[in-house]
């Protein structure tokens, strides 16, 4: 099925997409999305600690003499104690899930309120308020992503900041916020769809590493130029520092596919897309 037909099919099939009611891991008959949470009886909640002063990908800029503060680059990465890949675990007692009902079946998402608290709160509040009702999956790109949730501003009444966690990744099935730049999250989100096979065929980690080598050269060339800010604005998402990514993360993408360069926790210029759920 080509991309055009798939896009058209989704636009029709999810005309009634989501709202929220509190249930325990089960659906109801309505065409809506539910967010539910069961009492945590066995597993304590994970505490995610934001530690902006720890070494991150942004240190590369400082190593070549770029003052990140003057560029407004102030990363606040959430460092989590869960193992790499935990987002693929099945929901347990105490976890929060959302069920999106469509005429082509349900989409169940496990939400991550500890790792992306403000983003999950925004999603739940919008859904409870019925803001996602009758919204569309407006764009479907085969082996890339499904875009949806365009229903206006955030539940906070304005765009809000990114929440990059070093244990949540844009692997296949990950749900992340759409944005138009740093800290511009509102209501829209996307579901990553790139398969492991496509990821490999596109060059995998070698392709990403070569891209980063090229970006490093350009950053060094622009570092003393008044064009540096413009370069970062245009190429920010591509400033994915593969030198700082652990082998366990590389393996995760090799096995599951996804769009690694969208991860903000390993981006040298604090750009990326907040992951807040997993299908």
What are the roles of these predicted feature ranges?
Residues 2-14:
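Bacterial N-terminal signal peptides that target proteins for export
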Residues 16-20:
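Core hydrophobic alpha-helical transmembrane segments of single-pass membrane proteins
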Residues 21-27:
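C-terminal motif of bacterial Sec signal peptides marking the signal peptidase cleavage site
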Residues 28-279:
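Cyclophilin-like peptidyl-prolyl cis-trans isomerases
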